[in-house]
């Protein structure tokens, strides 16, 4: 028995790690190599990965996209429809 919840409409690729108490809601896609910590909430229609790391106790609202290689530390809140890319512009503060 899983110690996390994934709605039946979501897709979880092979080679992913999902922490205890995490909930993944409708129409999400979690790509290969992604690690999601404990007690996270992933809202509807979220795309994560590949090779993304999400810390513990994170809340990711509906329609968020998190692209390859992004790392979110513990206790991060992502508002609706935000997009995290893997492009870091010179002289940018992240």
For each predicted feature, which ranges?
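Flexible, glycine/small-residue-enriched loop-and-beta-strand segment within the central core
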Residues: 2-8, 14-16, 23-94
């Amino acid at each position: 028995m899983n110690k996390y919840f994934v709605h039946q409409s979501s897709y979880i690729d092979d080679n992913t790690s999902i922490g205890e108490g995490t909930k993944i809601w409708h129409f999400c896609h979690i790509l290969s190599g992604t690690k999601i910590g404990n007690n996270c909430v992933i809202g509807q229609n979220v795309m994560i990965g590949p090779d993304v790391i999400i810390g513990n106790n994170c809340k990711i609202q509906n329609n968020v996209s998190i692209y390859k290689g992004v790392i979110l530390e513990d206790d991060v809140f992502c508002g609706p429809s935000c997009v995290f890319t893997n492009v870091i512009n010179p002289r940018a503060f992240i």
